[in-house]
Amino acid sequence: MGFCYYEFLLIFVSYSYYEVYTNSQRAFSGLGFTHGADEDAAYITTWLEVCGLDGIKLLSLKIAELDNTFNAIIDPSKIRSEFDFHNQSALMIGPGLIDYLISKIDNHNEFKISFKNCNDPVFLIPLLYKYAKKNISSQFISSQKINAQITHN
């Protein structure tokens, strides 16, 4: 039994959060992400997917770039009012960077930073959302650079 030229088959499949998370984690592990970093990246991808922001699609567009290129080293002495991602994915650098910036909030009520050469800032949103529950808010302003303001309320 075949399809006519104008017929389309639509299949709707749903997955649980756990299925998306574990499969994403396996993918990141296979891409060379270290233990812990693979969990952070899987959380980011799954959060975006669950919120309807196409986390899996975004991941599939980045796979070639991420394959065996994991490098999440951040030099804290180079983090001032601007941070250069050097076109590395926020999936790699984002978790450590956001944790560091949140630690700066302990010493100040407000911290402003511009992200330079960040080609995938959408991956920072789930990381910042986690801290919203702790009365730490953030704001993104997109222009040539990504400006972020992180504030402790």
What are these regions (language model features)?
Residues 8-87, 91:
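Long alpha-helical, hydrophobic tracts
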Residues 56-153:
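A glycine-rich, acidic short-motif signal
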